[in-house]
Amino acid sequence: MEAVVNLYHELMKHADPRIQSYPLMGSPLLITSILLTYVYFILSLGPRIMANRKPFQLRGFMIVYNFSLVILSLYIVYEFLMSGWLSTYTWRCDPIDFSNSPEALRMVRVAWLFMLSKVIELMDTVIFILRKKDGQVTFLHVFHHSVLPWSWWWGIKIAPGGMGSFHAMINSSVHVVMYLYYGLSALGPVAQPYLWWKKHMTAIQLIQFVLVSLHISQYYFMPSCNYQYPIIIHLIWMYGTIFFILFSNFWYHSYTKGKRLPRAVQQNGAPATTKVKAN
């Protein structure tokens, strides 16, 4: 326990003062409490509350929620690009700019906004529970939604920006596509003919992790790189690798083995019409 406390104090010594005043950023206690409450609700409290209730439809809410996240994700991508990735960054070894220049402060702001978007996206799982789509609350889903906000909190608390922000920009780009799909599918039958690309969603996720891993792996082959926190490089590389394996496993069991294909397809080998599950 003492080692954990010492590690916490050591990490907080490196906290970036520019982000101290942002909501949720004073201490890790609040974000940790939110995530623990989230896990408790989706794994225990939520299913018990819904056990003897009919599922909520939430169609109107899902349409607004998903298209709002499309807009937010687009804005985050734009801000990352304007905060360095289309101006001063080299896309190779890009250290963190700890100055108070307008561009550096813009990067701090969008890094925080990305973290906030991960908190908002916890609603994905709450929607599953309220609609009694418990089968969609997989280990991969829960792990991804609970680990990323917490790890990103520490990332922006200490090192907002630099080459470590690449994966956040790519993730937001993927979420533009993902929430567009969810929003269209929430519209109902009118949008079904345009959702032929459902199977490619996991492929897009896999491409994301390949890009993240390739970009961050450059660090290991550079003669020198003055990025200030190499530990973040190592963690991002681990993140890309672990989630590539998890999503590859999901792809294999969902589509290669056909576990998520309609029963008619599995039995007869012929196409069947099914509703796409939104969000």
From Swiss-Prot:
It is found in: Endoplasmic reticulum membrane. This is Very long chain fatty acid elongase 1. Pathway: Lipid metabolism; fatty acid biosynthesis. It holds the Pfam family ELO. Its EC number is 2.3.1.199. Keywords: Acetylation, Endoplasmic reticulum, Fatty acid biosynthesis, Fatty acid metabolism, Lipid biosynthesis, Lipid metabolism, Membrane, Transferase, Transmembrane, Transmembrane helix. GO terms for biological process: ceramide biosynthetic process; establishment of skin barrier; fatty acid elongation, monounsaturated fatty acid; fatty acid elongation, saturated fatty acid; long-chain fatty-acyl-CoA biosynthetic process; sphingolipid biosynthetic process; unsaturated fatty acid biosynthetic process; very long-chain fatty acid biosynthetic process. It comes from the Eukaryota. The modification N-acetylmethionine is found at M1. The lineage of its organism: Eukaryota, Metazoa, Chordata, Craniata, Vertebrata.
